[in-house]
């Protein structure tokens, strides 16, 4: 069972983005390079869900 919150679209920027990645990825960790095109464009400039964030987990 997946909560509705995980599917909600949000703008994730800066520290909020990193916190959300920690939450979603847990011990797997994640690949985060703020200068690289990708997660910031997908999740800060336009809304994305926690499902989208999970694509950036290791």
Swiss-Prot record:
Keywords, sorted A to Z: Carbohydrate metabolism, Disulfide bond, Glucose metabolism, Hormone, Secreted
InterPro entries, sorted: Insulin, Insulin-like, Insulin-like_sf, Insulin_CS, Insulin_family
Compartment(s): Secreted
Disulfide bond residue pairs: 13-44, 25-57, 43-48
Cellular component GO terms, alphabetical: extracellular space
Function: Insulin decreases blood glucose concentration. It increases cell permeability to monosaccharides, amino acids and fatty acids. It accelerates glycolysis, the pentose phosphate cycle, and glycogen synthesis in liver.
UniProt family annotation: Belongs to the insulin family.
Protein name as it appears in the record: Insulin-1
Species this protein is from: Huso dauricus (Kaluga sturgeon)
Lineage, top ranks: Eukaryota, Metazoa, Chordata, Craniata, Vertebrata
